[in-house]
Amino acid sequence: MGPPLAQELTQACNQPLAATSNLQPDDGYKIELRAENTVDKYPAKQHARRVAAQIRQGKGLIFLMGQKSTLHEDSDQERSLRQRRYFFYLSGVDEADCDLTYDIKTDKLTLYVPDFDLRRAIWMGPTLERKAALQKFDVDEVNYHSSLDEDVKKWAKNQDPGSTIYLLHGSQGPAENPPNVIIDSKALKLAMDACRVIKDEHEIQLIRRANDISAAAHLEILRGITSMSNESHIEGSFLNTCVSLGAHNQAYQIIAASGSNAATLHYSKNNEPLKGRQFVCLDAGAEWNCYASDVTRTFPITHQWPSIEAKQIYQLVQEMQESCIALVKEGVRYLDLHFLAHNILIKGFLTLGIFKGGTLDEVKKSGASLLFFPHGLGHHIGLEVHDVSPQSIMAQGINDDSNNKLILPTCVSPCTTSSPALTSGMVITIEPGIYFSQLALDNAKPEQLKYIDMARVKNYMAVGGVRIEDDILVTKTGHENLTKVPKGDDMLEIIRQGKKGNDSHHV
């Protein structure tokens, strides 16, 4: 790895997170992460104003419920808290049993925290106090939960008949709906989705930190992979690094898929031996202050390419990804990048002899490439790993007849219907992949099989699957890659050097 990227990585990871962890400086990837969050208050009030502007009403009350403390079924053990993301967006509060209201007309954001419970405090520690919460969070007032219903009634009495209370869901409202108000459970979600898709600087910094921690964890695995013998060792190492650096939650379930397991897109058993397998596909991303990272690297269990076929497929996926990333900027239609990735795959497979007997357009129209690349190029990322948007970045335009076969339901998940251009402030993933799935091939359609040389495919089945994924910030002039994990030959060099010197975490 040359000095420029090594320096960039060091700079990105040296932003203050406190509690230093110095991971393997010998290979040029010196990462110093500190676990203390020194970023300013989460901008909840700014978010509330943005949402109100999207609702386009000069008055009304936004009412949002946070996640409640709950027990596992038939158990006295509490479930781990996962805060409701819409609530977090307007509060910055990652604690259970809180609610909020925002009076649009008076611009007043009020947080409601649990009433003091002595027994719970003795067992679990004290809950938020009003004064401490007011200092910690970007809100105008903090009240105890016992006053919430009465406060809503008082608000309603002071409003004109027909005033609106905005809810995320009809089931998440006040205990009693005041008789003189309208309950709207549609407008709020649409408004919040429109706001959440464009990240402000504070949100970008949180996603950046999540990526920096994920980078440290991925690098630690590359340095130690030659001493690991099971997928579970990879998962354990990733979790250990993340938790040591203050990231106690993962943005999604870790995928540590070796060999043919990598052909299963969301494989999660992570319990099989690595011996005799060519590649590991590691899809794993830490969460920081409720914001996700989503990072995938595919690598061999030794410091060299395990076969010529493995090298060919890896380099083809890397070309797909880097070609698409290079074109990311404001105004680009994301779906066109998805089509570009398929075009590169088809050209590559024609060259390798995996596809035969047709032109690029003929193969594309048959849908043959979908057998090997069966998902969309990527998605938004933010408070959810598949973040929300009022419109899908993967939806079909009106003049895409020649590409119809390349659009599957998975391409638009989890969003909805139409496709706008990329906009500055969006954070998206670029994650092409090539998979050799026996299940997919066994269920191929005749028009797809027409262009596939199955004898040639057999030579590639042991590759399993290759996916490479980075998180990309869209800017006015282009993009910024937030993911600082090596690929290709740089990746192999990290594996070759392995662990040198002191590999402990100083946290």
Curated annotation (Swiss-Prot):
Co-factor remark: Binds 2 manganese ions per subunit.
Transmembrane region(s): none
Sequence positions that bind Mn(2+) 1: D294, E431, E469
Any GO molecular function: metalloaminopeptidase activity
Ranges in a coiled coil: none
Example GO BP: proteolysis
Sites where the protein binds Mn(2+) 2: D283, D294, E469
Catalytic activity: Release of any N-terminal amino acid, including proline, that is linked to proline, even from a dipeptide or tripeptide
Function: Catalyzes the removal of a penultimate prolyl residue from the N-termini of peptides.
Family affiliation: Belongs to the peptidase M24B family.
Full protein name: Probable Xaa-Pro aminopeptidase HCBG_01484
